[in-house]
Amino acid sequence: MTSEQLTIQTDDGKELFARKWLPDQAPSAVMLIVHGMGEHSGRYHDFAAFMADQKVAVYGYDHRGHGLTDPDQKGHIDHDDGFKALTRDLKKIHRRLNREYNGLPLFIFAHSMGSFVTMRYLQTAEDSPA
């Protein structure tokens, strides 16, 4: 298993800190971790490493206002457009992974606030992301 750090630029120019855990062999599936309020993607390292050992490529990112995306904000999300921005960010990342791993099953693992962001994304998607 190898792990790497990266950044993902959103449509409005925000840079999101992200991590990926890749299996040593070709992956059989992909998992996107969408963390909860006050968390960050690094909290899922042990779980992601375990999944990578099961031949699953795992990606996680730090939401706006969280983790290494915004280390000084401690979970603050903009009141006017924050939740919509989180949903747009998930859409961009999910679609990017679908293109990159075309044909592989892609699962979203969402916790707490991340589950609300994920549900909203699934409800508002123009096409079926599932």
Kindly give the residue locations of the regions a language model identified.
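N-terminal cap/lid segment of alpha/beta-hydrolase-fold proteins
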Residues: 1-25
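A structural signal for the main folded, soluble domain(s) of proteins
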Residues: 18-24, 31, 47, 71, ...
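Short coil/turn segments at beta-strand junctions that form active-site/ligand-binding loops
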Residues: 28-29, 55-56, 103-105
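Short beta-strand element of the alpha/beta-hydrolase
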Residues: 28-36
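Conserved alpha/beta-hydrolase
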Residues: 43, 48-73
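Alpha/beta-hydrolase active-site loop
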Residues: 79-98
